[in-house]
Each structure stands twice: as C-alpha cells, then as structure tokens.
Amino acid sequence: MVWKVRRVVTGHDQDGKSVFIMDGYAPNVLEMASMPGLALTDLWETKGAPASNDGNADAAARPVHLEPPKNGTILRIVEFPPDSQWRQSADARKAFDSIGAGHAPDKHSADPMMHKTSTVDYIIVLKGEIW
C-alpha cells in the first residue's frame, strides 16, 4: 500500500510575506504497473540552479519522470516492496520506459533496477532494508 505523504509548501502573499500555500497529501504519486508495489511520490522539483522562489505554482504538478531538468532537482519518495513480492514478475524495461528513462538501465549490472544517469541521488532508508 502506497504511503500517503503530507506535504506542506510555503510561498508568498501579495505583500511578500511567507505564508502556507499548500498543506495536504502529495498528489503526484505513480504506482509502477510493471513493478508491483513500487511507487514514486514526487514532492517538489526545481528547474535549475539557483532555484527560483517566485510564484506559488505547484512545482511537482507534472508527470513523474526519472531525471530532473538539467541543473535541477527532484525531491521524491520511492517505496520498494520486498524483493519476494516483485523480483520475479518485474519488468524493469517497461518501468524505466514509463518514466521517460529507457536509456538509463545499467546493462552491466545483474540488478534490473540499477541505472546510470547524470544525477546525484541521496537515499535515506526510512523503513526496512535495501539489498
């Protein structure tokens, strides 16, 4: 079951004062049909560096894709099911294709989910373990 993640976003009112503009469950969730139990929840995206804080638009309101824009970032939660639930029936190629990353799988790795991109990924395990 996919976690419902509360996302609180601040912005600015007409006087430039910081205010809360969003407070609710993150709406941008993708459950991977080709990999049962794998889910991506995007919380925010920046288009480049330095990031702009102009406007109050939802920066995560767009289709889920693997890589951020050039010099940009994605704040994402990835939920991995236990290997026993998906490893045998997984279709990694379909999964990567569905998020615009058919070029990313690492053909030299025995793990179908390993991939290479021009990004730096920070991973924090909140629950369970990753092998």
What are these regions, as identified by a protein language model?
Residues 79-82, 115-131:
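Short, conserved beta-strand element in jelly-roll/cupin
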Residues 100-111, 118:
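A contiguous catalytic/ligand-binding core that recognizes phosphate-bearing ligands
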Residues 1-105:
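A short, N-terminal "cap"/entry segment at the start of jelly-roll beta-barrel domains
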Residues 66-67, 112-114:
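Short Gly/Pro-enriched turn/cap motifs at secondary-structure boundaries
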